[in-house]
Amino acid sequence: MGVSQLPTDNYWLSLAYYDLQTAEAMLQSKRYLYVGFRCHQTIEKALKAIYAQNNNEVPPKIHNLARLLKLVELEDDIPHDLFNVIHELNPLNVASRYPDEDLAI
């Protein structure tokens, strides 16, 4: 993929915004498991937007929010409450796809 074909940070941010709107719609319809998953996706794509902007390259194909925070060097700069929310959402990426992985949800 040539540099002109790289997804931009705007691309990732528009996907993140779409996921946020989807999470809000699911919250209104009480689809709570999927709200968590979409919130995870929102944060993941927002972090990938930061990565794309900072590195001028396609973000890695990972879904671990804690790892993405480290890659964009924000883990020490975000408010403690947001840091905790990100760590609470992190397992929902797997749990919503494979419900038997964590029956406590």
Go through each PLM region and give its residues.
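Terminal alpha-helical segments
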Residues: M1-I105
